């Protein structure tokens, strides 16, 4: 798809679904859309759901007029970084207006101002994680132009949303979000998403350095991996899709993702949807914060910026982190009590009262990395022309859904098929078995062994370990 200097404008969607009087009807009611979102265990693209959103016109040029010269922070990165991920701690930052960004993106011959040090052919710029409540603090009326209520979340709008504006090559390193699931509305330009399921976590080499609350990074540059250093990555099952204007991508809980801009200008809007599992995840994150801050501060108390992500304002004291942990544990118990009161009103077959352990088991059963609940999709698949699954097969076809946002079809004209549930379960079990057998029983030590603080932290705050610690904390306090 050709794109001009400003980038691709949002496309007009085809009027395929009409009501009795000729008005356009969305393929899913809010109730049905929410039901689908809460039951899906794999990424999928919603089509024809945002044709009436005022925010569909939010090109970067339009937003530059709305913001009226307001400065925002851009992350500057190199277009080529080899096999090493370009973490945010390795980037530089520029405060500029959208007008200055668009000028830099279009005309290098007359460039001046904050971007003058950055050669457009070598650098990309990304205004990422821009929360509406901060960006539009004096223009709150624009919140209503984003209508997540159409997906079954009444009252949810721009106030709970984040804006992303980038140039060609701008990307976020591969990571998973600790909380919630994600809805992403592509407004302008195209973005390519590389996604990996939660059960592939051992193959993604997770790390918490740089540290950012609620983000687990991968040590791998997934678009140019170092397979000698990270051989297990070959076992990961990449799901790749190109998101076009007018489409909304659903990213389930704990799915790894690397996102890159394919056009000169891209604009996206997203919202993280809270889930029941987040209550326990907050305990896990509090444990992680305490361990990372304690060990890294002791190692290098004078240079926190070497390990702290720029999104984190400052490192916190042990006392403050202890308060975070206790607050998270108390909040979990408060949630259990409220849930217990609700369940007490419903008759139970065995007459027993639900306990904390039961709530933990329920949350674990809802974990997308488990096999429980995976059969829901098999009973009644919601997929069709307006809801297209992102599967490994999409990657084999060269990244389906790349062209026309009207139909959400692959290049060969066929809709992407869902990976059969039984096959998905078998692949998941096989991957976990391989992960457990990957290390030799008696590993051979190299000639020189040096265990760094980061090496230790990679073990201590591995997602599997922090989940176990959080569960032990909850169980210990509930006895």
UniProtKB/Swiss-Prot annotation:
Gene3D superfamilies in alphabetical order: Cupin
Protein location: Cytoplasm
InterPro entries: Cupin_8, HSPB1-associated_protein_1, JmjC_dom
GO cellular component term of the entry, any: cytoplasm
Chain segments annotated as transmembrane: none
Biased composition (Basic and acidic residues): 356-369
GO MF term list: 2-oxoglutarate-dependent dioxygenase activity
Pfam family membership, one: Cupin_8
The organism's place on the tree of life at top rank: Eukaryota
Keyword Cytoplasm applies: yes
Tissue and organ expression note: Widely expressed. Highly expressed by Sertoli cells in testis (at protein level).
Location of the region described as Disordered in the Swiss-Prot/TrEMBL record: 1-25, 347-412
Domain JmjC: 124-288
Annotated spans, Interaction with HSPB1: 88-208
Subunit structure: Interacts with CRYAB and HSPB1.
Function description: May play a role in cellular stress response.
PANTHER family from the UniProt entry: HSPB1-ASSOCIATED PROTEIN 1, HYPOXIA-INDUCIBLE FACTOR 1 ALPHA INHIBITOR-RELATED
UniProt protein name: HSPB1-associated protein 1
Source species taxonomy: Eukaryota, Metazoa, Chordata, Craniata, Vertebrata
Record gene name: Hspbap1
């Amino acid at each position: 798809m050709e794109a001009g200097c400003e980038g691709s404008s949002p496309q007009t969607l085809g009027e395929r679904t009409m009501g009795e009087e000729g008005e356009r009807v969305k393929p899913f009611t809010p109730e049905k859309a929410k039901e689908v979102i809460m039951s899906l265990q794999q990424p999928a693209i919603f089509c024809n759901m945002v044709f009436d959103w005022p925010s569909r016109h939010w090109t970067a040029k339009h937003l530059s007029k709305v913001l009226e010269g307001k400065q925002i922070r851009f992350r500057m990165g190199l277009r080529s970084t080899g096999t090493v991920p370009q973490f945010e701690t390795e980037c530089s930052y520029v405060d500029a207006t959208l007008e200055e960004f668009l000028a830099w993106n279009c005309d290098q011959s007359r460039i001046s101002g904050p971007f003058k040090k950055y050669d457009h052919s070598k650098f990309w710029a990304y205004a990422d994680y821009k929360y509406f409540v901060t960006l539009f603090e004096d223009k709150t009326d624009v919140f209503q132009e984003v209508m997540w209520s159409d997906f079954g979340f009444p009252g949810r709008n721009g106030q709970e949303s984040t804006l992303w504006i980038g140039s060609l090559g701008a990307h976020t390193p591969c990571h998973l979000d600790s909380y919630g699931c994600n809805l992403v509305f592509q407004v302008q330009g195209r973005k390519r998403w590389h996604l990996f399921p939660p059960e592939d976590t051992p193959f993604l080499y997770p790390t918490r350095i740089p540290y950012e609350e609620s983000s687990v990074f991968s040590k791998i540059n997934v678009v140019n991996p170092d397979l000698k250093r990270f051989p297990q990555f070959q076992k990961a099952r990449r799901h790749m899709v190109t998101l076009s204007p007018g489409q909304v991508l659903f990213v389930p809980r704990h799915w790894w993702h690397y996102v890159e801009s394919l056009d000169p200008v891209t604009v996206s809007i997203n919202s993280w949807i809270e889930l029941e599992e987040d209550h326990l995840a907050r305990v896990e994150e509090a444990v992680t914060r305490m361990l990372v801050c304690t060990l890294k501060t002791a190692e290098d108390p004078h240079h926190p910026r070497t390990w702290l992500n720029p999104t984190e304002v400052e490192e916190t004291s042990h006392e403050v982190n202890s308060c975070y942990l206790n607050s998270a544990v108390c909040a979990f118990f408060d949630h259990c009590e409220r849930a217990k009161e609700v369940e007490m009103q419903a008759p139970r077959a065995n007459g027993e009262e639900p306990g904390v352990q039961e709530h933990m088991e329920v949350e674990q059963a809802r974990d997308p990395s488990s096999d429980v609940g995976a059969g829901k999709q098999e009973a009644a698949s919601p997929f069709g022309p307006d809801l297209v699954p992102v599967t490994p097969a999409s990657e084999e076809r060269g990244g389906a859904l790349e062209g026309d946002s009207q139909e959400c079809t692959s290049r060969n004209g066929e809709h992407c098929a869902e990976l059969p549930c039984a096959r998905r379960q078998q692949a998941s079990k096989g991957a976990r078995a391989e992960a457990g057998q990957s290390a030799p029983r008696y590993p051979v030590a190299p000639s020189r062994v040096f265990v760094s603080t980061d090496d230790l932290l990679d073990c201590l705050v591995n997602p599997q370990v922090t989940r176990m610690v959080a569960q032990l904390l909850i169980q210990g306090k509930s006895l």
